[in-house]
């Protein structure tokens, strides 16, 4: 974890593999210029998501808020202007040791801005699999015209050779 409370390294000891791309971090990323013609929550332009987001670095505080035998939880608090962010990063032992849960609480007070969770994984594949609610679809990553994807509950990115994959799940 870096000084901003962002995850800069996840190492899978089972196969000796770093999961976060070098120089990147799993983080909340803030785009401060969300240009939209009418509907900023739905009309996200490619130029917005292709811009370099800013790191959230104000008033960062990291604490250990749970220290159980099977689960440890870090609490990361930070702010940007009037918006406040709290993340709970749950790390597990035993049969769930391969899993990390991140719970976000956001008091969003920003205007004309966009918040995204970034997961720059050290996996290579031009195609990912996304849920549709009643099925799934495989499609390209960050391509025109479909640079935004409709993955409500989960997305899976597996190496092109099928040797390793990670899934991101959402329960909201």
Predicted regions and their residues:
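Catalytic and substrate-binding regions of extracellular carbohydrate-active enzymes
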Residues: 1-106, 111, 117-118, 141-142
